[in-house]
Amino acid sequence: MLERRNIVLVSFVSLVLTGIVVAGLGTSSQKKHMKLPESSPAPAAKSDDASLAPEVKPSPIVVAKIGDYEITKDELVGRLLVEIRPHSEEYTGPWKTVSPESVLLTLVAEKAMMMEGRKTGALDDPILQAFIERQKRQKLGNRVVMDYIRQNLTVSDAEIDQMMKSRPNVTREQASMLVQRAKGIPMLEQFYKQLQAKFHYQAVKENFAKASAIHERLLLNPARPRNESWILNSQVRDDVTKEEKAIVLGTYDGGQITVKDWLDTLCEIAPPGRPKDLNTPEGVEKFLDRTLRSAMFVAEAKARGYDKDPQYLREIRDLEDEQILYKVQADKTKDLPEPNEAEVTAYFEKHKEWFANGPLVKTDQIWCQDLATARKAKEELDSGKDFNSVKESYSLQKNVQPYDTYRGGEGPFWDDLWKAEPNQVVGPMKGFYDDGLAWRVVKVLAKTPAKDRPFAEVRDGAKWTIFSERRRTLLDRYGKELRDQYKYDVYLDRIQDLDPLDVALYPPRGK
């Protein structure tokens, strides 16, 4: 229930920060059974009851270090879950074994790329800067609004019952969301007004006409021809002068809202949803409220010290690293040439079977909670029980109809499936399930051999397969160079127990 509530909270907050509020939280009776985080955790009370003691999490196991980065075993396991899964069902070569050691070295290389990117000024890129600043504001604003909602918004069972009487076609959950929306919108509007007063917000109305004129120039008379009928981010970046960007539209304690802030907010909105009255000062003022809303929540977050919170700072550092890695890899591969027609043709001729239609195996499957359950299901099938009956008793997916499986989707499990004959039941065997793996028992219904496809049908697929291989090779080589350049340590003795096909077994981690 807590997980469901937090999911809805995030949706609620993202809409609040854009001036649109739709909420869905727990009822007051549900709250009695929830442990909700506070904005500033109080010291834990002493108790002789061990069940009330705070959970002590084990220290993470560090499996590699490079610079000030530490790679934990959990991070490695998470990446293994990604790497073991096939990435394409259409164009597939031989299954490539994934080892914890190779994935760990890839992670080390990526950390080295992040270090190199920071050293060479990747964070100075204006597009990257704008993205990170936007994420910072969103995270800070989210926390303020989530704290306020948790502390102030409750919905009683009686209110839900009343809503269901007035709206007999809605479910109880839908009724709860309707009540919360009705109560939450005015509540948050009041909070927003309180923040404006707290931070002494003042509109600079004499500049609204200037903002309107800049908007009309960008929209109707772009400096360079564009195919789109709306204002682009690049126009705000390149076609608005430094002086125009700095025009102040509103002030508050510790900050101000400029034309650039106003235009940036506009460009965050999909064009069909952008206001149509920004050619007037009144339209400028109305839309300014949208920019101000985020600014007020962020100002409150900073007043509470949320921008100094270690968890927030770690999240921003991780976000920066992620974006630096993308940029470094993109810059390194931007001049990689596309394969020519002769290369694509030669590649296709050498690997025709990778681009064939099929082979495929039509299967009916019993996905099981664990190996013991799979063994029990197989024993009952071997004793002559009906497959559908056993599936109904044991499968995690009881209503899934038989479907075709492909070499690309099965990866390391394909050979065992292809060896089976129609009407044969095989297993227990592992298979890709949800975000990981699960044990299953499989009934093979039919087998269809591969059928070659003409080159014209797969030219683009072959071309991009070559390009992807070249890109991967280039980045692997670059990563090795950086690993040699930066000092690092790996602790292979700490990952000896990792089997990629075991760490992903159902149920998924965290469930």
Give the ranges of each region predicted by the language model.
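Signal peptide processing junction and immediate N-terminal pro/mature segment
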Residues: 21-41
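Sec-dependent N-terminal signal peptides
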Residues: 2-28
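Envelope-exposed proteins and targeting segments
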Residues: 59-62, 67, 72, 245-248, ...
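Peptidyl-prolyl cis-trans isomerase
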Residues: 97, 101, 134-147, 161, ...
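N-terminal targeting/tethering segments
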Residues: 36, 41-170, 239-323, 450-461, ...
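Buried hydrophobic packing residues in well-ordered domains
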Residues: 68, 117, 163-164, 175, ...
